[in-house]
UniProtKB/Swiss-Prot annotation:
Keyword Iron-sulfur attributed: no
Name listed for the protein in its UniProt record: Inactive 2'-5' oligoadenylate synthetase 1C
Tissue localization of expression: Expressed at highest level in brain with lesser amounts in spleen, kidney, stomach, liver, intestine, ovary, skin and testis. Not detected in lung, thymus, heart and uterus.
Keyword RNA-binding: yes
Gene Ontology MF annotations: double-stranded RNA binding; nucleotidyltransferase activity
Source species: Mus musculus (Mouse)
This protein's UniProt keywords: RNA-binding
Length: 362
């Protein structure tokens, strides 16, 4: 579909997204029904009758599985099983293998026991003693599939699960615990899955036009993966860059267009070496421990894109070669016809700094 995106003009981008990138609604409806069945089954069966008190407290979905940012064709998502009666992030780390084995056992049972609206396949890893687990829900007729990465997690936010306010004062104690354990264990960024609720809330009430822009970015990312066949930066880092662009454009009085936002996103990718982006939705500089840690984080090597729900995780990763490859593609794409106006001039980019300016230190 690269030729399709390259052959249109800027004013046609929104139509392209609606016509070619939206997933089939029938598939999404059936997918949600099957996800509900799988979640209920695992919550009921995992560790049923076990002597220890650990049970699945809830199941939370993450990633691109719903109507907001799912793509036509293939998407990736997460199913997070939160376990209660754990006391630390370290305990999650130590018992991960046990949890994955238990979940896999019941997923395989479920595959045999229940009918599904779409095709259900448990993915088995080729590596012995693997600690990863996934399953796929697909419809060959509709050429749609979603692969789910299944993750067990410490339910550190259980008491705050119904909190709808993005206020750091509610979460500072949790983040202080996270920072202490992560730095002690040298596992910074390894527990971001525990904050899946916050990842979802970060995106939940955004404008549909942002979701469509993210769809376009994910489509572009897939085209780059198919062409380059080399490791690329994490997709989530690009989604957060898209949010950063959108937030800036939303503050302006000028007319906001998909082409201008997309081209600005590509410009940020091209200048990745300067990226330092973070949000203060759930953590900020008012808590002493969290503030000290954030100041250290924000002085680290770039690109730096902090997970909005986990200050210990640099979503940009550390593979500079991957960023360099994608940056070159971004520079090429900035000259594409999909950024040309009717008079053949290029759509301008926003005057947007690759560094978030509101910083608590100098």
């Amino acid at each position: 579909m690269e030729n399709g995106l390259c052959s249109i003009q800027a004013r046609e981008l929104d139509e392209f997204i609606c016509d070619y990138l939206f997933p089939d609604t029938t598939f999404l409806t059936e997918l949600r029904a099957d996800i509900d069945s799988i979640s209920a089954f695992l919550k009921e069966r995992c560790f049923q009758g076990a002597a220890h008190p650990v049970r699945v407290s809830r199941v939370v979905m993450g990633g691109s599985y719903d109507e907001h940012t799912a793509l036509k064709g293939k998407s990736e998502a997460k199913m997070v099983l939160f376990f209660n009666n754990l006391t630390s992030f370290e305990e999650q780390l130590k018992r991960r293998g046990e949890f994955v084995e238990e979940i896999q056992k019941h997923l395989c049972q479920l595959q045999q026991e229940k009918p599904f609206k779409v095709k259900f396949e448990v993915q088995s890893s080729e590596e012995p003693n693997s600690r990863s687990l996934s399953f796929k829900l697909s419809s060959p007729e509709l050429q749609q599939e979603v692969e789910f990465d299944v993750q067990p997690a410490y339910d550190v936010l259980y008491e705050l699960r119904n909190n709808t306010y993005a206020e750091p004062q509610f979460y500072n104690k949790v983040y202080a615990q996270l920072i202490h354990e992560c730095t002690t264990l040298e596992k910074e960024g390894d527990f971001s899955i525990c904050f899946t609720d916050l990842h979802q809330n970060f995106m939940r009430y955004r404008a549909p036009k942002l979701w469509n822009l993210i769809r376009l970015v994910k489509h572009w990312y897939q085209l780059c993966k198919e062409k380059l066949r080399e490791p690329l930066p994490p997709q989530y880092a690009l989604e957060l860059l898209t949010v950063y662009v959108w937030e800036h454009s939303n503050k302006n009085q000028e007319k906001v267009t998909t082409a201008k936002n997309f081209r600005t996103f590509l410009e940020l990718v091209a200048y990745y070496k300067n990226l330092r982006i973070y949000w203060t939705w759930y953590y900020d500089f008012r808590h002493q421990e969290v503030c000290a840690y954030l100041c250290r984080q924000l002085k680290k090597a770039r690109p730096l894109i902090l997970d909005p729900a986990d200050p210990t995780r640099n979503v940009a990763g550390s593979d500079l070669q991957a960023w360099d490859l994608l940056a070159k593609e971004a520079q090429t794409w900035m000259q594409s016809s999909c950024f040309r106006n009717c008079d053949m001039s290029f759509v301008p980019t926003w005057d947007l700094s690759p560094e978030r300016q509101e910083c608590a230190f100098q």
